Amino acid sequence: MFVVGGESLIDLVPVSSEPGAERLALPGGSPYNCAIALAKLGNETGFLCPISTDGYGDLLLGPLAEAGVALLLGERVAAPTTRAIVSFNEKMQASYVFERGAERAFTREGLLAALPERVATLQLGGFVPIEPEDAAAWLAVAEKAVAGGATLTFDINVRPLLVGDEAAYRRQLSRLLDLAHLIKLSDEDHDWLEPGRSIEEHAAALLARPNCELVVVTLGEKGSRAFSRHASASAAIYSPPVFGDTVGAGDSLMAGILTWLAETGALAPARLGALDRAALERTLRFGAVVAGLNCAHKGCKPPRRAEVDAVLAG
């Protein structure tokens, strides 16, 4: 079973580029998107995040149920749903301003109790390392999962506007990365975390951490790269026939990569680090198709497995 932990929220997305344009309320949040994408690709998936009792919380539940994602924290919370106010640049790449709420309404004990006994892979990321108390709770979850034999995967997904104490954030992130077997980051994450350092140097530093065996870096329209302990590879993006926007593209790519690795028996310690160039290329290609099909829509709408297979077969 995949367990995905982290935030869910509502993206308030403008319907046009005009100032003051009406905004659509769309379910989102990086871990939320990844959980749905994993389930739609055919994986048994549980989501570890509180959901509000408000109307936006109802809106979040619909796609989870449709995809078949199990809610691991069953009781909903009174805190309002976290909101992300979305803006787009000329390339339709998204940026966000956040108002946090229900996704933080948890306790360490509650998260640990909700973690299933048998977890094959725990996927964390997004807001998880930002607040010290939250980060400590998620670290305990990660430690429990890894001690039980789970593979830990982590999508860094830095949100600089939410980072009040950069030194504390870096410490909290570092503790989680020390446990992770697979680490994903974007070129924007790289530039914020390691300005002036090459991606190759950054990947090597991550691979030198105690558990890390695979690093994936997304490069926007330039595609993606992967680095194992023995090889590296790159892949181009997949461009859908009709383009919507890039919301959830990285989350969809992550779900695709995890799905491919799990299906090929590589999503496990010692196996990730042994991936050669050809295996990395196939992994990135699968992830790119999942991400590209998501980008055919407005907002995050990851594809079903049959859609991905149809593209790969063509």
PLM region spans:
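Glycine-rich phosphate/adenosyl-contacting loop at the front of the ribokinase-like
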Residues: 1-69
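Conserved phosphate-binding/catalytic region of the ribokinase-like
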Residues: 3, 143-144, 197-314
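Active-site metal-binding loops of divalent metal-dependent hydrolases
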Residues: 6-8, 127, 156, 252
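Short, glycine/acidic-enriched loop or turn micro-motifs at the edges of active sites
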Residues: 10, 14, 53, 158, ...
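Conserved N-terminal subdomain of the carbohydrate kinase-like
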Residues: 44-126, 311-314
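Short gly/ser/thr-rich secondary-structure transition/capping motifs
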Residues: 100-109, 162-168, 272-273
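Conserved beta-alpha-beta core of the PfkB/ribokinase-like small-molecule kinase fold
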Residues: 121, 127-205, 212-213, 222-223
